[in-house]
């Protein structure tokens, strides 16, 4: 897998950092847009491993840091779930202009909820996949514990998530509550693949059941037995990427173009064609 660094303008004009993962030989049949988990980054090992597995299926993967996170510009305190959705749409627009429009959307954790909401604004996407996604974005507030009252009363507070400090604002929390996911999932209108671990301690398996129930067919569920929420074990993220790649080929594969007899003869080649009846081989 090769990673090509890129930058593009997010929804608020901030310059966002991205990576385009492509197969070693550069041959790409489709592109996927990947949304990372809450307060994570495009360089999370799980995201990289999923990308590596997809490139083996000739699916390029565009990963980026949301505004205010990772190597991207902007202030995290001024962002929210709605701005994440807008950043995804901005990324898809950039891909369509400069690379290739995303044929598949993939989201991890809150990024999974974001791709479910963004899908109706990204018409090129023919399939959607979520990994450990919450049914309701407001589920994220469980991470703030008893600081929620302080956020509501004071307007903002600093919380520690995975050893890092983030300023969480009242507008961020209120925005999480303003999204009706059931209707959005019901009108997705695309094949959906849901990955979730039955032992996920951050986003319980009941969330996957609700997403599955709200979605229409074709929809599929894959249980990530014994996996943690962040897919810290390499085998888990590689498994997700491998299964996702096989599933995606059904929906985003490039059309097969058969060579004509004249094209087969070109370049000093000899080709044989077998018929469908009797035992006959034709040298063309």
What annotation goes with each model-predicted range?
Residues 1-26:
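N-terminal cap/lid segment of alpha/beta-hydrolase-fold proteins
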Residues 188-189, 194-196, 200:
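Short beta-strand/loop motif that positions the catalytic acidic residue
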Residues 123-171:
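Hydrolase active-site cap/lid region
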Residues 39-51, 66, 206:
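The serine-hydrolase catalytic nucleophile loop
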Residues 227-239:
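Catalytic histidine-centered segment of alpha/beta-hydrolase-like enzymes
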Residues 51-73:
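Conserved alpha/beta-hydrolase
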Residues 247-284:
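Extended beta-strand/beta-hairpin segments
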Residues 78-98:
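Alpha/beta-hydrolase active-site loop
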